């Protein structure tokens, strides 16, 4: 396969949802230059994976630290400062005003971009009702997106189904990072609001988070390259 355009390659974020640093390093080695952007979430971070952020950054890779910070402002700010020092590119916080304000202030004018999580892509209207909300996913996502834009957050994490509507709300410059991406024929897993890579890009997503379709593929590098090719065709 021809070498991918780095701009297209970096729109794919591979989720390193593995239980150990050794497993993460093995997958990174398999993927080689086919992937330029990785996500480290709870599982790997709590298994000693945070130093991998700095290692990947030194190797010229981008890293999305998906810890969904949500605490009092001072605690959030200190966490942002620590993660920024490791060289992270993206960091998630929950889309509550105090949390977002603290994260944006602590980020300053560094290269770290703060992403606000609107509503988890595993949630639907019935889940919100169970949690006591009196309105649905769409209304909550829109309200939180407008708050995030006003506060100065750099991007949103949203389902691909919401990307087109949110792009109209936040404009062309804000990052829209979408999990719930499944190539045609892939199992949905625990995601309820999913879309193929090409459709998500066409809908307005700036970056696609893909885990199992790459991590569990017989040939992970080939799977990643196929997704990047689909991104390039949709751009």
From Swiss-Prot:
SUPFAM superfamilies assigned to the protein according to its UniProt record, in alphabetical order: Ribulose-phoshate binding barrel
Pfam families (alphabetical): OMPdecase
Keyword Lyase belongs to the record: yes
GO cellular component assignments: cytosol
Catalytic reactions of this protein: orotidine 5'-phosphate + H(+) = UMP + CO2
Entry EC no(s): 4.1.1.23
InterPro entries, per database record: Aldolase_TIM (IPR013785), OMPdecase (IPR014732), OMPdecase_AS (IPR018089), OMPdecase_bac (IPR047596), OMPdeCOase_dom (IPR001754), RibuloseP-bd_barrel (IPR011060)
GO MF annotation, one: orotidine-5'-phosphate decarboxylase activity
CDD domains for this protein: OMP_decarboxylase_like (cd04725)
Catalytic residues of the enzyme: 68 (proton donor)
PROSITE patterns (UniProt xref): OMPDECASE (PS00156)
Keywords in alphabetical order: Decarboxylase, Lyase, Pyrimidine biosynthesis
Signal peptide coordinates: none
UniProt-annotated binding residues for substrate: 17, 39, 66-75, 121, 182, 191, 211-212
Annotated pathway: Pyrimidine metabolism; UMP biosynthesis via de novo pathway; UMP from orotate: step 2/2
Disulfide bonds: none
A GO biological process held by the record: 'de novo' UMP biosynthetic process
Family, similarity comment: Belongs to the OMP decarboxylase family. Type 1 subfamily.
Assembly, per entry: Homodimer.
Protein's job: Catalyzes the decarboxylation of orotidine 5'-monophosphate (OMP) to uridine 5'-monophosphate (UMP).
Annotated protein name in UniProt: Orotidine 5'-phosphate decarboxylase
Taxonomic placement: Bacteria, Pseudomonadati, Pseudomonadota, Alphaproteobacteria, Hyphomicrobiales
Encoding gene (name): pyrF
């Amino acid at each position: 396969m021809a070498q991918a355009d780095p701009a297209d390659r970096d729109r794919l974020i591979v989720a390193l949802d593995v239980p150990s640093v050794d497993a993460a390093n093995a997958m990174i080695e398999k993927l080689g230059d086919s992937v330029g952007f990785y996500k480290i979430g709870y599982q790997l971070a709590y298994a000693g994976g945070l130093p991998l952020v700095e290692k990947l950054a030194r190797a010229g890779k981008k890293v999305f630290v998906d810890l969904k910070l949500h605490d009092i402002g001072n605690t959030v700010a200190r966490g942002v400062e620590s993660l920024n020092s490791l060289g992270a590119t993206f960091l998630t916080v929950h889309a509550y005003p105090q949390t977002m304000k603290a994260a944006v202030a602590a980020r300053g004018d560094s290269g770290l971009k703060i992403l606000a999580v609107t509503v988890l892509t595993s949630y639907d209207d019935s889940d919100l009702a169970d949690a006591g909300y009196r309105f649905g996913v769409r209304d909550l996502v829109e309200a939180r997106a407008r708050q995030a834009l006003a506060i100065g957050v750099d991007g949103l994490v949203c389902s691909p189904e919401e990307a087109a509507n949110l792009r109209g709300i936040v404009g062309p410059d804000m990052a829209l990072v979408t999990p719930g991406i499944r190539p045609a024929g892939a199992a949905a897993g625990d995601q309820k609001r999913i879309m193929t890579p090409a459709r998500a890009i066409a809908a307005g997503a700036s970056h696609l988070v893909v885990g199992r379709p790459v991590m569990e593929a017989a040939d992970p590098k080939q799977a990643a390259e196929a997704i990047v090719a689909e991104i390039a065709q949709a751009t």
